[in-house]
């Protein structure tokens, strides 16, 4: 495969072989494995297993999200400016981020080294802080480098959707791996101790520390293998330092007017940048907050057995996995906006179901299918819309993805901290009031944020995505 050119200007369309598409799609697998644990199990591990306060657990998650949010636009800006002779700037940042994730993530889900029963909570939380910051820097570097490769590798809108859908399909596979491994480790733990099937609230405790530690080690081991496959199979083109490319048989006889570079400061003047940013942020809030609180909802509101913190998220992501394969034909038939709206309707149906049913029982599996399919649909479509926004301006694409992710990470962290601060049982793991608390949290993070996402979508229906023409002389 020849290296892709830098822009989507005149010339042959850039396409990828199946092997190249698959090798690209697995480049975010380590991040997805870690994110599955981070969002689904971090609060549960810190609050229910380690016994830290709900506010302390929320503070650590907020620290991670803010660190990620601050690093993301900086990495995006540097990735647009950087150069690397051997592998290209995006892959160089991807490699640096991967190393940071591998070295830091296992410590987050392990006991505090040197801490004892007399260690104050603030000291233990302080211990986890540096590992979380390093992990989030690495996660941000890997995410932005990987996302910003999409508009550089292919030019066709449908191929961008296909790459994004393949990427999300492996995101689902990663989460299936995490939840399947979690179920297996919990099952093996129960078999080893000959425990009876009792309520999850009674089972989760300090005895589960080895389960989460082993799960984290498994995550980084498997993720490292897939990161290696990405670097071996994905070729990033080296950027030319000159305007334009050498003429070939696809070059028009009369050259079009030169299109000025769209720099990071120019994006800040584009209304479409804020419209897509709001849609992306609300989409990520729905996906991440529902993933963060589903385990708490199952544990404390529905009082389901321990295995459900693995099986229900597994059902969600299996549903999302199968839905991701419908993205390309559905987008082609009804367009981006209607595809997103369809996914949003499914999520609102889930929110209504949760709000109206005090005890779902076996129906929780059906609700999980709805949530998984809806989240997959809106996430893939919002990423495709972001690629549409960037269009041929791939030289500043990493900044766009960085800015989008900054808003989503900080918003997620603040939302989690707000929820944790409102927790009605500050002095114990769960009192009677927290049963309804997590019930309404799940309703709000899907239905309430879903309404905000619908408003953002309406703005794109009224004012479609477009970049205003600028004077070519308007350069720094």
UniProtKB/Swiss-Prot annotation:
Instruction: Reply yes or no: does the keyword Transmembrane apply.
Output: yes
Offer one Pfam family short name for this entry: MFS_2
Q: Which reaction is this enzyme known to catalyze? A: L-cysteine(in) = L-cysteine(out)
Q: Name one GO cellular component term.
A: lysosomal membrane
Q: Where in the cell is it found?
A: Melanosome membrane; Lysosome membrane
Cytoplasmic-side positions: 1-25, 77-94, 143-167, 235-284, 328-343, 386-398, 466-476
User: A single Gene Ontology molecular function, please?
Assistant: cysteine transmembrane transporter activity
Instruction: Outline what the protein does.
Output: Transporter that mediates the import of cysteine into melanosomes, thereby regulating skin/hair pigmentation. In melanosomes, cysteine import is required both for normal levels of cystine, the oxidized dimer of cysteine, and provide cysteine for the production of the cysteinyldopas used in pheomelanin synthesis, thereby regulating skin/hair pigmentation. Also catalyzes import of cysteine into lysosomes in non-pigmented cells, regulating lysosomal cystine and cysteine storage, which is essnetial for redox homeostasis.
Protein name according to UniProt: Major facilitator superfamily domain-containing protein 12
């Amino acid at each position: 495969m020849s290296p892709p050119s830098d822009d989507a200007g005149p010339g042959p369309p850039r396409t990828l072989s199946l092997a190249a598409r698959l090798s690209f799609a697995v480049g975010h697998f380590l991040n997805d494995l870690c994110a599955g644990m981070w969002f689904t199990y971090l609060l549960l591990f810190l609050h229910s297993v380690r016994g830290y306060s709900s506010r302390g657990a929320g503070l650590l998650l907020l620290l991670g999200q803010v660190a990620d949010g601050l690093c993301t636009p900086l990495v995006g800006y540097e990735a647009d400016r950087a150069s690397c002779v051997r592998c290209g700037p995006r892959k160089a940042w991807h490699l640096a981020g991967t190393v940071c994730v591998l070295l830091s993530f296992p410590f987050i889900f392990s006991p505090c080294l040197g801490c004892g029963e007399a260690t104050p909570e603030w000291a233990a939380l302080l211990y986890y802080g540096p590992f979380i910051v390093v992990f989030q820097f690495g996660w941000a570097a890997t995410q932005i480098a990987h996302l910003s490769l999409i508009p550089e590798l292919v030019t066709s809108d449908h191929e961008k959707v296909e790459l994004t859908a393949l990427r999300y399909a492996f995101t689902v596979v990663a989460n299936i791996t995490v939840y399947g491994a979690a179920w297996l480790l919990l099952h093996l733990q129960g078999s080893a101790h000959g425990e009876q099937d009792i309520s999850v609230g009674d089972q989760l405790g300090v005895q589960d520390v080895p389960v989460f530690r082993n799960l984290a080690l498994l995550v980084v081991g498997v993720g490292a293998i897939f990161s290696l496959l990405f670097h071996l199979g994905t070729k990033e083109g080296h950027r030319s330092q000159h305007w334009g490319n050498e003429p070939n048989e696809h070059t028009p006889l009369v050259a079009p007017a030169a299109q000025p570079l769209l720099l990071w400061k120019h994006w800040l003047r584009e209304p479409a940048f804020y419209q897509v940013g709001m849609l992306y942020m609300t989409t990520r809030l729905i996906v991440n907050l529902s993933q963060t609180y589903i385990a708490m909802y199952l544990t404390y509101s529905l009082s389901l057995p321990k295995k459900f913190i693995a099986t229900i998220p597994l059902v969600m992501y299996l549903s999302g996995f199968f839905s991701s394969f419908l993205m390309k034909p559905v987008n082609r038939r009804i367009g981006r906006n209607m595809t997103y709206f369809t996914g949003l309707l499914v999520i609102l149906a889930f929110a209504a179901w949760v709000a109206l049913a005090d005890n779902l029982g076996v129906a929780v599996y059906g609700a999980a299918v709805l949530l998984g399919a809806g989240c997959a649909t809106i996430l893939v479509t919002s990423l495709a819309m972001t690629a549409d926004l960037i269009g041929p301006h791939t030289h500043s694409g990493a900044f766009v993805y960085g800015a989008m992710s900054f808003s989503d990470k900080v918003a997620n962290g603040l939302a989690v901290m707000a929820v944790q601060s409102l927790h009605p049982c500050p002095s114990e793991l769960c009192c009677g009031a927290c049963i309804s608390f997590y019930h309404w949290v799940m309703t709000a993070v899907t239905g309430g944020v879903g309404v905000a996402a619908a408003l953002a979508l309406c703005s794109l229906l009224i004012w479609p995505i477009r970049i205003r023409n600028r004077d070519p002389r308007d350069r720094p």
